[in-house]
Amino acid sequence: MRSHPTFRALIALLLLLSLPASVSTASAWQDDKDRGEIEQGREADKQIEAQFGFYDDEELSAYVSEIGNRMAAMSERPTLPWTFRVLDSPVVNAFALPGGFVYVTRGLVAYAGNEAELAGVIGHEIGHVTGKHSQSRQRRSLFANLGLLAASLFSETVRDLVSTGLPQLATGLVLMKYSRGQELDADERGIGYATSVGYNPYGIGGFFETLQSLEEQSDRKKVPGWVSTHPQVDDRIERSRRWADEAMARYNLTTEDLFVGRRELLAEVDGVVFGENPREGFMRGDDFLHPDLRFRLAFPADWTVQNGRSAVVAISPSEEAYLKLELAAREEGEAPDDYVRRYLRELSADVSDSGRADVGDLAALEAVFSVQASNATYAVLGTWIDYDGRLYQILGVSSPNRWRAYSRTMRSSARSFAELTDETALEVGPARVAVTEVSQRMQLAGVIEQYPEVSVSPETVAILNHLSLQDLIAAGDVVKLVFGGPDLP
């Protein structure tokens, strides 16, 4: 959990992308459109950074940028100020914004098998920009599940609260869904770009196979972003192979002429954070522990908890109540009392009770109030805790007719906030990819057995390496393993 701007600001910004331009001539229209597209992309890029954060690895960022810029230079729009980013997210995903802004997650980079695969994915996103799909596509909002519950998991009550009313009740990125034809067009364009700069064009097909394996490993609620928002993988694998064949024939190439870059990618992936980063908070039983901010909070038993970059969200099993922990958006020098008064005033809240609260030995404020959202009234318990120079805001929400059933539980959870003193939790680090040399010829399963400290399942290791557990690894070859992370019960 970190302090970031609200979701509403990002929604407003992305809605702005859909506004039509008015121009007088074809050339002026194109120039204005390009300038407007670039400026919109730049503004959105700031919001993306605030919402998700860029992965802090200069070498990896430069590596991804170098791959992207070489292909962009061969595209139909080489003069755009292309920008390539690695997002600090474990979800396997990639997307592009108008103006030449392309994003891949560290999760996607970790699962790529070689540089040609990564180039295929980046080329695909370049294809969305060069194809101007964002200008012509049918706009449809959906939540990208980057560390938060997808909107479809919320009840109607919670969705109402997410979409209107209380500021910062949930965060997420509103993306626009491309048509099937646009996705396939981007695939074909990306394969062409990758081939034109010397990559093996079959790379993206290999990555589609990895996505297919992840889809088979996951239940449907956990399908990676690049699977859940794109056409059927089987169809894309078949088409990508055909387009790769055509690209090879067009340039009169053989596979020996083209670059795969397995060792090159593995050198960059070695040490990359894998999965959720516990430094930004993790669950141990019902307790949420945050090592960097040094606090803990007990959420109600059996509630579904998701940790995002700007908030921690918990929803009751019946989806009738909602808890959210976040940092209050205080103005510089604003006292806690002044912030709470301003917050309630800006909400037009009807306050029924307020005052000091007992949260251990920490100074805290509490208010019970109601707000209007989506033509309905909601009851809210707000708790504000002044700790270590920050003001923490905990909101407990339910409908008025369910308030008695949940208010005591939500108050107990809010008042469990305390300093984190567990040294083991304070020192926990993230799991990381480790490129490991194999000492003798053996099956992948045997390699894993040699390292009992591997912190992910054997099936995940197999997918990371594009292998089966029975595949033989030659002596001296390397594989991706994962070590570290919190020791969860």
Labelled PLM ranges:
Residues R296, D302-T304, L472, V478:
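Residue-level marker of beta-strand positions
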Residues R341-G389:
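Signature of long, low-cysteine stretches enriched in small and polar/charged residues
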Residues A119, V305, I394-R432:
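Surface-exposed amphipathic alpha-helical segments
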Residues R8-I11, S18-H290, R296-F299, R309-A311, ...:
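A Zn2+-metalloprotease active-site environment signal
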Residues Y103, L391-L395:
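Short hydrophobic beta-strand segments that form the core of ligand-binding sensory/regulatory domains
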Residues P458-P489:
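Extracellular LysM carbohydrate-binding repeats and other cell-envelope/extracellular binding modules
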Residues A425-S455:
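Primarily a LysM-type cell-wall glycan-binding module
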Residues M1-L13:
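Bacterial N-terminal signal peptides that target proteins for export
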